[in-house]
């Protein structure tokens, strides 16, 4: 039995083909482009509100009321401790930054309605993160380690630059700009350890001890001999002088004795006459 007209099998298949899947992304992109093209293109000094382009507010102001078909944008000044640095469509001004001393920061320029606070590093620190003239993070200047000296001192935007000590000099580290020369051991000292770029030469005083221990007894013996010779010479000189003076002493004694004898003889004669 033949099927009725119009009740036969369909001339097309209901199963999706590869071409159908390829059309889906194209349709999606087409709709997206239509939506983008439907939005108005605002100028640089305007901002988009719905389907309208509204004029931006000047630096130091914020949007109090957006524009409409019959009115423009209503702007208001930024309250204290807030600012806007550029033309904007912001409903609120931005809060002023705070320079935290615990982060090594100090206030370089106070905040205004059109400019944020400018922070710089306190002395002894340098800026690690710089945004124009504003610094957000500071680090302490590097201290040169032993064996190095300060070649260039740190500033508020640059760290300390260190350089190695040359041979014959040393540094204990720190903030000194010049390395110190090694100590030269004297003629009576011995070099125990040669200096390095971080330590000085070490000298020994044992040689001095040996020299003193040898010279001191010699000096004592020499002084004793010299004293003995001086005393002996003085004794000999005294003896020779005494011998030379003996005749004069005897003559003087005889001269003194004669008057005594004469006086005694005269007294005897007087006593005899009186008797």
UniProtKB/Swiss-Prot annotation:
Q: Which GO terms describe its cellular component?
A: external side of plasma membrane; plasma membrane
| Localization per Swiss-Prot or TrEMBL | Cell membrane
* InterPro entries, per the entry: TNFR/NGFR_Cys_rich_reg, TNFR_14, TNFRSF14/UL144_N
Q: Specify whether Repeat is a keyword of the entry.
A: yes
Q: Looking at the keywords, is Methyltransferase present?
A: no
Show the Gene3D superfamilies listed in the entry: Tumor Necrosis Factor Receptor, subunit A, domain 2
UniProt topology in membrane:
Single-pass type I membrane protein
Transmembrane stretches, by residue range?
Answer: 211-231
Q: Name one GO molecular function term.
A: virus receptor activity
Q: According to the UniProt record, which cysteines are disulfide-bonded?
A: 42-53, 54-67, 57-75, 78-93, 96-111, 99-119, 121-138, 144-162
Tissue pattern of expression reads:
Expressed at mucosal sites including colon and pulmonary epithelial cells. Expressed in naive T cells.
Q: Name one GO biological process term.
A: defense response to Gram-negative bacterium
Primary location recorded for the protein, binned into one broad class:
membrane
Return the TNFR-Cys repeat spans. Answer: 41-75, 77-119, 120-162
Carbohydrate-modified residues are 184, 197
Describe the processing and modification events after translation: N-glycosylated.
Q: Write out the coiled-coil annotation as residue ranges.
A: none
| Keywords recorded for this protein, A-Z | Adaptive immunity, Cell membrane, Disulfide bond, Glycoprotein, Host cell receptor for virus entry, Host-virus interaction, Immunity, Innate immunity, Membrane, Phosphoprotein, Receptor, Repeat, Signal, Transmembrane, Transmembrane helix
Renumbered to this chain, the signal peptide range is: 1-38
Domain statement:
The cysteine rich domain I (CRD1/TNFR-Cys 1) is required for interaction with CD160 and BTLA.
What protein family is recorded? Belongs to the tumor necrosis factor receptor superfamily.
Q: What does the subunit comment say?
A: Interacts with TRAF2, TRAF3 and TRAF5. Interacts (via CRD1/TNFR-Cys 1) with CD160; this interaction is direct. Interacts (via CRD1/TNFR-Cys 1) with BTLA; this interaction is direct.
> PANTHER family of this UniProt entry?
TUMOR NECROSIS FACTOR RECEPTOR SUPERFAMILY MEMBER 14
Output this protein's name: Tumor necrosis factor receptor superfamily member 14
Originating species: Mus musculus (Mouse)
Q: Where is the organism placed in the taxonomic lineage, from the top?
A: Eukaryota, Metazoa, Chordata, Craniata, Vertebrata
